[in-house]
Amino acid sequence: PAAVIQAVADIVADYNVIVCPGFQFSGIGTIATDNPDVDFILVDTNPTDSEGNDIECDNIYAMTFKEQEGGFFAGMAAALESESKKVAVVTGIAYPSNVNYQYGFESGVNYANEKYDTGVEIVEIPSYAGVDVTNKNVGGNYVGSFADEATGKVVGKALIDEGCDILFVAAGGSGNGVFTAAKEAGNVKVVGCDVDQYDDGANGSDNIILTSVLKVMSMNVEKQLNAIADGGF
């Protein structure tokens, strides 16, 4: 994150609007305060100062999403479609957005079990349990990185070996490894995350994607850029 924030600092004098996509940009608050004539669009996180304290800046438009809602429907879909009656969620790091996805998914499975008698088990491997920003163990299956395909594949294969036939993957680049594990298994479906991952699911003449949970971030960024162009913020 420090390198990311420095990258913003290096270019801030050259632009009127800077779009910062991702949680790693949350610490731009101090830069924004020091550059009140530059508008910042912060995607998928809220701004903090250099010490991680939440702040509000008139020149930062921060957009966040209710991941738990999309995760809920992913959980319902997984429970309703699972044939093995075992499903799981694989996430990257236990940041709030990922924990929201996890809890939403689990709630969706539990709801389907209660309302539709699906009888589906949520599989968690204790050695991959996540620890959130408050140092609380949140369970789940966390790769520990958003850019570790090798470990993603290991986690995915471990869950498949436990009998899971549907995996909800919210793990960034690490999720590519989970996709590979699912493709190699041949009888596993995956729920994609943030964008439509249908093309990523291609596996010969088949496709492993059951559905995808969308944030449609590009539309929200475009909307705010248009607002700035029209003189608003």
Please state what every model-predicted region is.
Residues P1-F233:
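A residue-level marker of the well-folded mature domains of exported/periplasmic proteins
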